[in-house]
Amino acid sequence: AYLFEREEIPPEAIRNTMLYCLDCHSKEGIPGKRGTSRAAMMFLSNWLNEYGELGIMSVSSEYLSGRSVYISEESRINHALNHGGVAVVRLYLDEEHYVLMTGVENGNILLFDPYYWDEPYEQKDILIDKDHPRAYNRIVPFKYFNQENEEIYSLGPLEEREAVLIYNEKTRTVPEEVIEYFI
């Protein structure tokens, strides 16, 4: 777990995540083989907020779609990543799938991509990282995400974009607490 220690996650949270995600069926009718729908992600975000409001878990969430989903120093995604949150984002790598963005570093997004990839990417600036298995396994420059096509790590067409920002309210930082000093 990245945002929470394993002991902090109630079994119901894991059960409900598994129950509500992977809700799309393949052409052959196999459940879960076409991933998770946008409706399920919106529902999951609302469900996490309710869990936080009830005090069951110190979690909050925000569902983003369309033009709100982009990468830049001013974006809500980058804001979340810079203040202790994560972003579950739908993007492309051969096909649409979700990745977990966990940080920002030197114009790159640190992310965990569940798709196994053992060969270096053709794009030499996309790096596979095996040294941080609890935080990220890819380092991807900002420039790939904001494309409106279906190329590697692009967020795709504006109207189809989606992200869920998630925070652990115990570790979330507010902008006033994050001070950078320039010499």
Each PLM stretch: what is its role?
Residues 46-62, 90-103, 125-137:
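Hydrophobic transmembrane alpha-helix bundles
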Residues 3-4, 77, 164, 180:
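Generic low-polarity alpha-helical segments
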Residues 62-121:
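Active-site-adjacent substructure of cysteine-protease-like catalytic cores
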Residues 32-36, 69, 93, 167:
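Alpha-helix N-cap/loop-to-helix boundary motif
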Residues 82, 104-183:
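Noncatalytic regulatory segments and standalone regulatory/sensor domains
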Residues 41-46, 73-77, 151:
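Intrinsically disordered, low-complexity boundary segments flanking structured domains
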